[in-house]
Amino acid sequence: MKAFTRLDGRAAPLELANIDTDQIIPKQFLKTVEREGLAKGLFYDFRFDADGNEISDFVLNKPEYKSASVLIAGDNFGCGSSREHAPWALMDFGIMCVISTSFADIFNNNCFNNGLLPVVVSPEDLALLMDEAKGGNHMVSVDLEAQTVISPSGKTIGFDIDPVRKEKMLKGLDAIGETMMHGGDIDLFESKRAISQPWLEA
């Protein structure tokens, strides 16, 4: 997993609440376990019409937001069914941080497990970020170490994050990476177990 320290990028305002995982990536795109190529399914029913043509007024289809790396979204983002493809699709599109007032628990966990940073801010700060991202300057800075978001106008917005999750994001550690940090202890345990319970070696 890639470490997340600081992100300076374009922010796209998605002024919709209760976006569920089926809207983030519909079920027809879940037939693969590959993480690459899922961007084509991201917000598919919002981005394309029944004939597969782009819907020009959807935010991520607008030229100024097509390269967005930060998504500013409405409350309760990522609700609905559990699908790890949701953060995969966002990341494959280039979005590495989602800012909202709240996230569904499973989606929130899946984000941290895959290196996508979910940032929770107050309704007032979200409204400010939404409004500013719709202006001529769409650039924001997300600093995980400092736990701040700097808005397009330069306002600094703080956010809270679990310290363990913060450390893992800063170091780029997923569950496997964290386990491998204890490789010496695991090897020692296996050596002792081989002596005390040799029948398990068969």
Swiss-Prot record:
One biological process term in Gene Ontology = L-leucine biosynthetic process
Instruction: Output the Gene Ontology cellular-component terms.
Output: 3-isopropylmalate dehydratase complex
| Reactions this protein catalyses | (2R,3S)-3-isopropylmalate = (2S)-2-isopropylmalate
EC annotation from Swiss-Prot or TrEMBL? 4.2.1.33
For the protein in the UniProt heading, the enzyme class is: lyase
- Give the SUPFAM superfamilies listed for this entry: LeuD/IlvD-like (SSF52016)
Query: So what does this one do?
Result: Catalyzes the isomerization between 2-isopropylmalate and 3-isopropylmalate, via the formation of 2-isopropylmaleate.
Under PANTHER family, the record lists:
3-ISOPROPYLMALATE DEHYDRATASE SMALL SUBUNIT, 3-ISOPROPYLMALATE DEHYDRATASE SMALL SUBUNIT 2-RELATED-RELATED
Q: What is this protein called?
A: 3-isopropylmalate dehydratase small subunit
Q: Which organism is it from?
A: Caulobacter vibrioides (strain NA1000 / CB15N)
